[in-house]
Structures are given as structure tokens and as C-alpha cells.
Amino acid sequence: MGISGSTEYTPKKRTNFGTIRDQYKTLEEVQDALRESGLESSNLILGIDYTKSNTWTGKRSFNGRCLHAIDGSGRTMNPYQQAIHICANTLEPFDDDHLIPAYGFGDVTTTDKGVFPFFPEERMCNGVAEVLQRYNEITPRVNMSGPTSFAPIINKAIDIVQQTKQYHILIIIADGQVTSPNATQDAIIRASNYPLSIVTIGVGDGPWEMMEHFDDTIQGRRFDNFQFVNFHEVMSRRNVENYEAEFAVAALQEIPDQYQCIKELNML
């Protein structure tokens, strides 16, 4: 186990706590680093963007279809289904109970004010398979709306962390069209006071400037708690043998260092 001594360390960003680097090249290196950091178990929280911009931001990357379009035959996955499958499957071995709280946001019932649970009474999904099954069931019935803010799902994740007093990884899958950047930025700063990592997966055509701002330049955080990954860019790279592993490495790149920061800040 461990990180190869030949790994190139590339400084990525400076925060109040220190520099977090993109340093891992393979999924095995990331998983080894997670274990070396002491992360024996974690808990996942999933947030899905149901804002109306999903209907047009797949013009280039998803052949003009809505990013939430579901193939009734089951032969192909949309970007949301792919991202859920890859990311959650990678992290599920670290999730002891395999129970995943899953929420949607940005639909006509929640707009930018709240979230809705995938199951009534906030019942959690039992593993990745049930997350995907429930996503397939509810998505055709969701009335997409807006405006777009990540603040409600981040604040919901903070509530869960406060209740459980355990480390969680919030995975937000979204098309990147944030229309409430100040509220989202404030929520990211607030989240840095808790044992919570935020991984945002951008699906569709972008633009991604706001996501890159959240990833790189937010001041006032206790540690660098936000990682952004451009799904289409990763999945379009050439000369890649295993696209799922490539995507998982990009999405989980900063989790080992984030968890180490959380421990050093005595949040657990």
C-alpha cells in the first residue's frame, strides 16, 4: 500500500489550511491513500440537479438530449446515471452500512430553497443499485425548474453530519449553471467547519467558470473542501484504457488530503 515515490506533486490551490495537490494517477493509488489517511469508513450523500437548464446543456455532449433523458431499454446511461454508478461504486466499499441519503434540488417544488428526498420520510437508498433504480423511477415525473443553488443540498449535508457526528462525502451532480453563487459560496465556507468533503461532478456542456471558482479561489475556509470534475472532459480523453477508473481518480483525487485535514483540525 501507499503512494509511489515517483508520483509528481503538482500544487493545485492554496487555502487557509494549506495546499491540496492532485497527485494520484491510478484508482489503486487513491484507494491506498484513503486507507493510509485512516479513512476506514465513510458515508455518502448524493445531490442531483433537476434545474431546467438540464434540458439544453447537453447540446454538444449528449447529442442535444436532456441530460436526464432515460433510455427505456436500459442499453445506454445518461450522464447522471453514469456518474452515480461510477462514483458511488468506487466509494461504496468504504461505506459500512451502504445506506445513501439521496436528494434532488432545483425542481418546481424546491427551486433554490430546499431539497426533496428520493424516498418518502427521507428513507435512505440501500446501495448504488437502489439509488439508480429510484433515480429511474422518479426522474420522468420531476418538473424541472430553478433557479440553481447548491446551498440547500450543502446545508442538508451539514445537518446530517451534525446529527451523526461522522465524516461524509457529499457528491453533487449538476450541469454547472449556478444562478445563486453567493449563497452557494457561503454554504461551502460554512461546510468547512464540519467533517464534510464536497465533490461536484459537472455534466453537460458547461460553462464551468463558476465551478472552477468554487474549486480554486474561495477564501475563508478552514480547509479545502470542494473538488470539481468535468465529467465530459474526463470521459472524452484519448488513450484511456478504463474510463470509469479515470473518472473515479479525478473525482476522489483530494479526498485523502481532505480527510487528513479534518483529523488535524480535530473535527472528528
Feature annotation, model-predicted:
Residues 1-268:
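Acidic, low-complexity intrinsically disordered regions
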